[in-house]
A protein has these predicted regions:
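Structural marker of alpha-solenoid helical repeat scaffolds
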Residues: 17-18, 51-53, 86-87, 120-122, ...
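Terminal, low-structured helical/coil segments at or just beyond the last alpha-helical repeat
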Residues: 122-174
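TPR alpha-solenoid repeat register
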Residues: 24, 58-60, 94, 128, ...
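Canonical tetratricopeptide repeat
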Residues: 27, 61-63, 97-98, 131, ...
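Register position in tetratricopeptide repeats
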Residues: 1, 34-35, 51, 67-71, ...
Length: 174
């Protein structure tokens, strides 16, 4: 906690020293959002997005979307993640975030589609596989539940997600 608090003056100095430093604004925005200062964080991301020299808009869009996720504002989160995907349709992190947004809205077919696109990029994580298991359970697609569950057990056997999945599967079979 003290390291985080000590970092803030450096972030502030970086954006004050160079107002056009969109990378510093993205970093500061992420720091502020993770600190629960959502409005201030979003202001940093929006400033970075307005910068005509920002050649990595998708980073600012991902950051703003993630900031909205922390306050469960799925509509705004989705808007920013979709903007990131316009410029980079195979951006794995945006695809995964869109799957989480769709799942939170109980849109399980869309969740499946975004996860499939995510996996097609070659990306994979314990969290994404657990989300796939949870989603396919909702769709009652037992073959896909087993496929993702087996991948989770094989690739991430010691993860907390593998433990969560085991409990989830046990209750699903009750």
């Amino acid at each position: 906690v003290s390291d985080r608090a000590a970092a803030e003056p450096y972030f502030a100095q970086a954006v004050d020293t160079d107002n056009d430093n969109f990378s510093a604004r993205n970093d500061f925005g992420g720091y502020l959002c993770q600190s629960g200062r959502i409005e201030e964080g979003l202001a940093q991301f929006n400033s970075a997005l307005r910068n005509p020299y920002n050649d990595a808009l998708y980073i600012s869009q991902l950051g703003a979307g993630a900031c909205y996720v922390t306050v469960l504002n799925w509509k705004e989160a989705e808007r920013y993640f979709l903007l990131a995907l316009v410029g980079r349709p195979k951006l794995a992190l945006a695809l995964y975030h869109m799957a989480k947004v769709a799942f939170s809205q109980a849109d399980h077919l869309r969740t499946r589609a975004y996860l499939q696109r995510f996996f097609d990029t070659g990306a994979e994580s314990a969290a994404s596989l657990l989300l796939a298991v949870r989603n396919e359970l909702k769709l009652k697609a037992s073959d896909l539940v087993l496929l993702h569950a087996n991948r989770l057990r094989a690739e991430f056997p010691e993860s907390s997600e593998a433990s969560d999945m085991a409990r989830l599967m046990a209750t699903a079979n009750d």
